[in-house]
């Protein structure tokens, strides 16, 4: 899929857990996509090399079935090798312009902007397709992440890009984030720890409808 044929980044933006069992990772990711996730980001800090490539490849096949973009976290080389739909970059993960050169004009590039509107403006000027702010709330995934004031979302509207909120987002606080201007909510913990992952994904999805 090309960027132009993909839906915009919006709704539930699911980020994979650190799961080493590829079969289980695919199974739970399928549940999330069936529940209405608008995008899936492959992020696994417990695997690398061939295993990471195999996992991402399996998820890409899955996302193709659901016509949902697969975004690779932090790894432009892996995204290019798999022809994934895009990459998400943090401040230390490489240059947006270099990623665009490596991936081509049709891939999605997202940028972590933490609590910094100036960083978001810079990302937009370099060609990012969406910007992410967070942590919006205390996060078990990144407990030391800087906190982002949700007032940033309204200010970031000037960029004309989809805005993703991340960090400690649950069903209890997501509606306020959306009302503040987030186009998508990136969720890890509140999603994968659910007894019924598909139902939990659907609950998040319904907040946007």
UniProtKB/Swiss-Prot annotation:
Metabolic or biological pathway, per its Swiss-Prot or TrEMBL entry: Cofactor biosynthesis; thiamine diphosphate biosynthesis; thiamine phosphate from 4-amino-2-methyl-5-diphosphomethylpyrimidine and 4-methyl-5-(2-phosphoethyl)-thiazole: step 1/1
GO cellular component, one term: cytoplasm
Catalytic reaction list: 2-[(2R,5Z)-2-carboxy-4-methylthiazol-5(2H)-ylidene]ethyl phosphate + 4-amino-2-methyl-5-(diphosphooxymethyl)pyrimidine + 2 H(+) = thiamine phosphate + CO2 + diphosphate; 2-(2-carboxy-4-methylthiazol-5-yl)ethyl phosphate + 4-amino-2-methyl-5-(diphosphooxymethyl)pyrimidine + 2 H(+) = thiamine phosphate + CO2 + diphosphate; 4-methyl-5-(2-phosphooxyethyl)-thiazole + 4-amino-2-methyl-5-(diphosphooxymethyl)pyrimidine + H(+) = thiamine phosphate + diphosphate
Record-listed 2-[(2R,5Z)-2-carboxy-4-methylthiazol-5(2H)-ylidene]ethyl phosphate binding positions: 139-141, 168
UniProt GO BP: thiamine biosynthetic process; thiamine diphosphate biosynthetic process
Transmembrane segments annotated in the record for this chain: none
Positions contributing to 4-amino-2-methyl-5-(diphosphooxymethyl)pyrimidine binding: 41-45, 73, 112, 142
E.C. designation(s): 2.5.1.3
This protein's record includes keyword Magnesium: yes
First and last residue of the signal peptide: none
InterPro entries recorded: Aldolase_TIM, ThiamineP_synth_sf, ThiamineP_synth_TenI, TMP_synthase
CDD domains the record matches: TMP_TenI
One Pfam short name: TMP-TENI
Listed cofactors: Mg(2+)
Top-level division of the source organism's lineage: Bacteria
Function: Condenses 4-methyl-5-(beta-hydroxyethyl)thiazole monophosphate (THZ-P) and 2-methyl-4-amino-5-hydroxymethyl pyrimidine pyrophosphate (HMP-PP) to form thiamine monophosphate (TMP).
Cited PANTHER family: THIAMINE-PHOSPHATE PYROPHOSPHORYLASE, THIAMINE-PHOSPHATE SYNTHASE
HAMAP family: TMP_synthase
Family label: Belongs to the thiamine-phosphate synthase family.
Name of the protein in question: Thiamine-phosphate synthase
Species, as recorded: Methylobacillus flagellatus (strain ATCC 51484 / DSM 6875 / VKM B-1610 / KT)
């Amino acid at each position: 899929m090309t960027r132009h044929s993909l839906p915009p980044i919006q709704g539930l933006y699911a980020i994979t857990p650190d799961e080493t069992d590829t079969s289980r990772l695919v199974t739970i990711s399928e549940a999330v996509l069936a529940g209405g996730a608008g995008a899936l980001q492959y992020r696994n800090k417990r695997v690398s090399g061939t295993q990471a490539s195999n996992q991402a490849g399996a998820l890409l096949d899955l996302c193709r079935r659901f016509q949902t973009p697969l975004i690779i976290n932090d790894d432009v080389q892996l995204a290019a090798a798999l022809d994934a739909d895009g990459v998400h970059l943090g401040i230390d993960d490489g240059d947006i312009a270099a990623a665009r050169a490596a991936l081509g004009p049709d891939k999605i590039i997202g940028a972590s902007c933490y609590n910094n509107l100036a960083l978001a403006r810079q990302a937009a000027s370099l060609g990012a397709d969406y910007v992410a702010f967070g942590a919006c709330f205390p996060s078990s995934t990144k407990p030391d992440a800087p906190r982002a004031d949700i007032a940033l979302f309204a200010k970031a509207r000037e960029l004309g890009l989809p805005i993703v909120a991340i960090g400690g987002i649950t069903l209890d606080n997501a509606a306020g984030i959306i009302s503040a201007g987030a186009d998508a909510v990136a969720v890890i913990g509140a999603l994968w720890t659910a007894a019924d992952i598909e139902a939990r994904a659907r609950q998040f999805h319904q907040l946007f409808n």
